[in-house]
Design a protein with these regions (language model features):
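Accessory beta-strand-rich segments of carbohydrate-active enzymes
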Residues: 1-95, 119-120
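Hydrophobic beta-strand positions in extracellular immunoglobulin-like domains
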Residues: 12, 55, 88, 101, ...
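Beta-strand-rich binding/interaction modules
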Residues: 21, 109-143, 148-152
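Exposed aromatic-hydrophobic patches
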Residues: 36-42, 148-158
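Extracellular and select intracellular beta-sandwich modules with Ser/Thr-enriched
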Residues: 82, 137, 184-188
């Protein structure tokens, strides 16, 4: 793990977390709808360390109301802690931090915004490649130290498979990053659907077809199992 990025991943927290490495405070995160991720690269050194995590479920910045279904005693309860995956993740110094996919059914392509992180102290060059459904494109990028944003468009050919509730076709996008020595330093895969979602004359449409949405509210009403 030497000379690598190291992150702590916490999948579902309720809901404010604060982290220390030994006696050094790393930071605080406060979110219900997304994992908490801490970058430990600058505070970890070879050797033994103690990670201390404090979970605070008091009603403060996030206030759903005392009788909301997420925290009231007669439904879910105001639980405290972390559930799901909790692990340390090692990443290369030049890595793919995030990918955001924008389908374009009229152009039969996807625009991919890729957030690349260069934790080296100097500028570096790399080759960014996108591949889906047998189609591939690559782009040479120059990365400054820190966070870099790269836009690229991948054409999917003349025949595309649209996504909707009756035909939930999905594509798999592979994003890879290759260094100057032709070594793949990082890669990730994301799934996406080719669909157009908009509002026309007050109606929601998917691929230009009106859709009607409905939901169900169960209120945690399962007395035998909680």
């Amino acid at each position: 793990w030497e000379q690598q990025d190291i992150h702590l991943f916490l999948e579902r927290c309720h809901w404010e977390t604060r982290l220390w490495v030994d006696d050094i405070e790393v930071g605080m995160q406060n979110a219900l709808g997304a994992p908490h991720q801490y970058d430990l690269s600058d505070v970890l050194r070879p050797g033994k360390h103690t990670l201390t995590l404090r979970i605070d479920n008091r009603i403060k910045d996030i206030d759903p109301g005392e009788n909301s279904h997420s925290i009231s005693d007669h439904t879910q309860g105001n639980w405290n802690g972390v559930v799901g995956d909790m692990y340390l993740q090692v990443r290369p110094k030049v890595n793919i931090a995030r990918t955001i996919i924008y389908p374009d059914i009229s152009d039969k392509s996807v625009r991919v915004k890729t957030i690349l992180r260069n934790r080296k102290k100097s500028q570096t060059t790399a080759l960014l490649a996108l591949e889906a459904d047998g189609k591939r494109m690559q782009k040479k990028v120059t990365l400054q130290p820190g966070t870099n944003e790269v836009d690229a468009v991948l054409s999917l050919g003349d025949e595309i498979r649209l996504w909707d509730e009756f035909h939930p076709n999905l594509y798999q996008l592979k994003v890879s990053l290759t260094d100057e020595e032709q070594n793949t330093t990082d890669s990730r895969e994301e799934s996406f659907g080719m669909r157009d979602f908009k509002v026309v004359d007050g109606c929601i449409t998917v691929n230009n077809r009106p859709v009607f949405l409905r939901g169900a509210l169960d209120c945690a009403a399962f007395p035998m199992t909680g």
